[in-house]
């Protein structure tokens, strides 16, 4: 019986080089037929430049994520917050500073989607968020109706995404949506580096999904947080991002959204109210 094709999708590295390297080491053992990069190489971690450099050197098929386009736009002088010098933006300021011309050019050149085609298997579509854009996540809060709307015009039966930082699957109107976990900053309570491995099933004519969880030396990324300058000016945003690394739970965006809904500043005083209200 012929060997069925396999491929891996890795995404949401988010400035965490030790996690990225651990996944690459695991892939060297697993040896899939192809490897694809699903975006969000930068931000949320202290090694954005190093992660982009590693990805660039690999030369693998890759797409962009919402954090990549966001930081690249700021590197080009666009979408700069009015309070850019505030410590809340320290992580982004430092990450943008790591985007050398070659790194920025690589990010600028990334497509939003990729068509995965391996001999002997049905094609799949790789996106970062959803087929409609990198900021729209397909996950637990995504209804069947929303999923069906997001898939309008998509020819592939299998759509693979990232962005939400936890693995998730759904079948809608004959389509198979698969979302991989995050390499650098998971939000499913598992602090290991995570990625997706796919194998074609010749009997069901579908892609089988395996979520891989790879241990790595977390002290290396914690040391990078301490040595990078991200925490030097008391940035609350940096502290929340570090907490996400330590807990594998989301903290930054819920606080951001809570403040926006109440027209409150992103300050420690607001965060104290946020924590008290959430319990």
Label the model's feature ranges.
Residues 1-58:
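N-terminal active-site segment of His-dependent metallophosphoesterases
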Residues 2-8, 116-125, 172-176, 204-208:
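Beta-strand-turn-beta hairpins that frame and shape the catalytic cleft
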Residues 10-11, 35-39, 44, 61-66, ...:
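Active-site neighborhood of phospho(di)ester-bond hydrolases with catalytic His/Asp-centered motifs
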Residues 14-19, 43-46, 67-73, 158-171, ...:
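Active-site environment of divalent metal-dependent phosphoester hydrolases
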Residues 27-31, 118-120, 153-155, 197-199:
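Glycine-rich phosphate-binding loop signature in dinucleotide/nucleotide-binding domains
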Residues 51, 57-116, 122-123, 141-155:
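Active-site neighborhood of divalent metal-dependent phosphoester bond hydrolases
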Residues 128-172:
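Ligand/cofactor pocket segment of small-molecule handling proteins
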Residues 171-180, 184-279:
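Acidic, His/Gly-rich catalytic cores of divalent-metal-dependent hydrolytic chemistry
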């Amino acid at each position: 019986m012929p060997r069925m094709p396999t491929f891996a999708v890795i995404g949401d590295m988010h400035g965490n080089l030790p996690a990225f390297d651990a996944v690459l080491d695991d892939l060297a053992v697993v040896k899939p037929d192809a490897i694809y990069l699903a975006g969000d190489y930068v931000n949320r971690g202290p090694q954005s430049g190093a992660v982009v450099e590693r990805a660039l050197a690999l030369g693998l098929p890759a797409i962009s994520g919402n954090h990549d386009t966001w930081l690249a736009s700021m590197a080009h002088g666009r979408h700069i917050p009015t309070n850019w010098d505030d410590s809340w933006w320290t992580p982004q300021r430092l990450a943008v500073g790591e985007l050398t011309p070659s790194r920025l050019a690589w990010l600028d050149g990334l497509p939003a989607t990729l068509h995965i085609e391996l001999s002997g298997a049905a094609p799949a579509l790789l996106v970062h968020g959803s087929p409609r854009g990198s900021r729209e996540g397909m996950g637990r809060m995504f209804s069947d109706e929303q999923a069906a709307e997001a898939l309008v015009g998509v020819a592939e039966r299998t759509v693979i995404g990232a962005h939400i930082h936890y693995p998730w699957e759904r079948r809608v109107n004959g389509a198979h949506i698969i979302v991989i976990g995050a390499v650098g900053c998971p939000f499913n309570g598992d602090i290991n580096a995570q990625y997706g491995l796919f194998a074609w099933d010749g009997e069901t004519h579908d892609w089988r999904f395996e979520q891989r969880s790879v241990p790595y030396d977390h002290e290396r990324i914690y040391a990078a947080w301490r040595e990078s300058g991200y925490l030097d000016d008391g940035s609350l945003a940096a502290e929340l991002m570090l907490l996400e690394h330590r807990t594998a739970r989301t903290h930054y965006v819920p606080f951001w959204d809570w403040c926006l809904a109440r027209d409150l500043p992103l300050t420690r005083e607001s965060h104290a109210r946020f924590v008290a209200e959430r319990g």
